[in-house]
Each structure stands twice: as C-alpha cells, then as structure tokens.
Amino acid sequence: MSDWSGSVPANAENGKSTGLILKQGDTISVVAHGWVKYGRDNVEWAAPDGPVPNNPQPSSIATLVAKIANKKFAIGNGVLHKTVPVDGELILLFNDVPGTFGDNSGEFQVEVIIESRYSPLK
C-alpha cells in the first residue's frame, strides 16, 4: 500500500504535487516505471533512470527527480529506505532543460511510501 500513487507527466515543468508533506528525518521509498519522449526526434526517449543509450544527455537531464523545499534529489527508477534531508512537500518531476518541456510527452507511473516518520526522543 502506498501513501501516494500517480503519474508524473513529462511536460509538467513545475512537476507533480503529491500532497505529501515530509519532515527532515522521515524515511521514504519511491518506485517508478514508464517511458517518456522529451524532444522532437524519435531517439529522445527516457525511462525514469535516464535516456536511452543512443542519445546520451548530461547525468541529471531526462531523469525522474524529487523536489523538496526547492532542492532536487535524484530518484531515477527508485530509491529505497532514504532519509528525507529537508522539510517540505514532495514534488516529483521529469528533469529537463527549463523552457523545453513543451515538446515532451508521456508520463512515469510512481509510487511513494513513507516508511517512518521522524520522531526524536524527548
């Protein structure tokens, strides 16, 4: 059972809001799959982990990332048991060059599980 499940469109420059408010110290897992097209050419395809090998891009471009408090974090095909470094809402997005999202299409399917909430001893 996931805390959030949905699609992350490749053409959403501001990403997809999950509505999940995370706190520093929470532990989450994220799993993603699917294919998106991020350009006009027929070789510009990417999975959450990045572009197909015949069209290499800089390491952070054409990948799935999380944004929390305006800081980006690599997600790719998924992360397991990761500690959230900052407080904020979890936004998921396809990382592309700003201003170039208009020719993107497709979406990733993503599931997010909040495994534990940070609760320090008092």
From Swiss-Prot:
Instruction: Tell me how this protein assembles.
Output: Homotetramer.
Give the binding site residues for Ca(2+). Y38, D96, T100, D103, N104
Q: Which residues bind an alpha-D-galactoside?
A: E44, Q57, D96, D103
What is the protein named? Answer: Lectin A
Keyword set includes rRNA-binding: no
Arranged from A to Z, the UniProt key words for this protein are: Calcium, Lectin, Metal-binding
Function noted in UniProt: Lectin that specifically binds alpha-galactoside-terminating glycoconjugates. Shows high apparent binding to the alpha-Gal epitope (Gal-alpha-1,3-Gal-beta-1,4-GlcNAc terminating glycans) as well as to Gal-alpha-1,4-GlcNAc and Gal-alpha-1,3-GalNAc. Gal-alpha-1,3-GalNAc may be one natural ligand bound by PllA both in the nematode symbiont and in infected insects.
A GO molecular function held by the record? metal ion binding
Any Pfam family hit: PA-IL
- Spell out the family assignment given in the record's similarity comment: Belongs to the LecA/PllA lectin family.
Q: How is it used?
A: Can be used as a fluorescent probe for the specific detection and visualization of the alpha-Gal epitope present on porcine tissues. This epitope is mainly responsible for hyperacute rejection of porcine organ transplants in humans during xenotransplantation.
